[in-house]
Amino acid sequence: MKIIYGPKGTGKTKAIIDGANAALDSAKGHVIFITDTNRYAYDLKYQIRFLNVSAFGLQNEDALRGFIKGIVAANGDNEYIFIDGIARIAGKPVSELESIFAAMEKLEKDFEVKFVLTVSAAKEDLPEFVAKHAN
């Protein structure tokens, strides 16, 4: 798992889009990009599966966790899952998302999928369960 962090307006979304596009060049499996807006859909290479969670009515952490697990379960060829704004999508501060981070760690281990996430916070404000994945 990789965390792209920083206060709002520090280029996290551009960094995750660039990361997804770069991952596609070396990926042997599928690359998926999850966010809650269509704003950046055309910044991603067309081969990346773009999912706007707003279209699926996700409104909380449990729904997001189920959505992510469903994506992994539906296709064993998924290699990368990029999530822009996980706390915003889950509707909670990142400090309250330990269970979804634990679920993603388990998915990485069990299904060899790699997660890349953006979190709007300074490094010193990241909870330990997030900070251990931040560079």
Task: Identify the meaning behind each predicted range.
Residues 27-28, 44-46, 75-77, 109-112:
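Short loop/turn elements that form and flank the Walker-type P-loop nucleotide-binding site
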Residues 2-4, 31, 79-83, 115:
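Generic beta-sheet signal
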Residues 24, 72-73, 105-108:
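N-terminal cationic-hydrophobic initiation segments that often serve targeting/anchoring roles
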Residues 12, 60, 64-67, 82-86, ...:
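Amphipathic alpha-helical interface surfaces
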Residues 71-78, 98-99:
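N-terminal targeting/trafficking signals and adjacent low-complexity tails
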Residues 1-70, 126-128:
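Conserved P-loop
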